[in-house]
């Protein structure tokens, strides 16, 4: 008769064996090949087998056919990785319609959906990670239907008719990381609207609505938010404290609102902000302390399509990490020689196109020793002297000065010669954008590379000598001229330097 110890050992081994067997059965079930049901059972829906499960599309049908297709899928334990209901007549999502189904990504798009019953999604709480109900007729957040989706990561409510977000509208969505409510009719967001989203929410899109002010109280609890989109609203003013509580914000988009000024310290709490978009407003004034608090991290600043008449240098000077500065499509007519002093040494991209700039001061680019891309096309420049461009030629890779009223001159001879030397390079932009200049005496336009050099008495004069690396390495071009040279087109100038 076996001893007590031997018996216990045998029982433990048996238990271990059963546990291993159970694990094997679970693994086998999860790894078992997924199969679509017969096409006739789910028609007009169609099914495909994908790597992670079934991909089912129900398009241009109605609630009866969708309900029939869902019933055919029940009891077979498939993983439905994508269920896409698009362009259907589905005004109401019935309760328990997805009961006993394992759905990971659910899309109900452009299907006239106006009502989501409380029990319609309740069975999906442990599996659903993405829900897209965009382009429908929802007039409010379907809070009761969402509250059990405890593993949801992404919720898309774009293009509906939601006008208000009530308190605790997203309660239960503890794991939500992305919430997008773009192009609705939002006018009011209650103070506790986002209660419960503070743990995980990283991105919030409230763009394309009718908000007239920043919903500060509702936003202040989202201390883990990384990206906030408020573009295309009717926000007229922003003030200090509007963004308090958003200390981890990396990107803020306020483009295409109705702002007329940027007041002092308005972004003071956003010390980690990397990107700020203010284009498409009517901004004519930026306070000297407007960007206080952003000194250490702001790298991308977009101020295009506003009403600025000067470069706001005083406000920009503290931004010593700024890399990308976009000032296109303003009303800037004069640039001071010290416009970029104090902050220009880190800028790699500068866009000044579509302004009214007539003259570039000799030392205006003196501090831009990291500049790689310069866009000054579509201004009113007649001359761009070599002395202006010389400080940035070591770093410059792209320069675009198309659509300026340049005057044909012997000073431009270096440019067509440079183009010929670069002709073997695959430069699509260079081929599409060929600069032009006007011959004063003839009142005629020429492509710069086709200027009549003999009639201009330019032949025989030394304008440049050059050497180019044969292996496509950065080129070095030396200009030998007593005249000032013009940069007259768009060229990729890999580390080129003009002397």
Predicted feature residues:
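Extracellular leucine-rich repeat
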Residues: 2-499
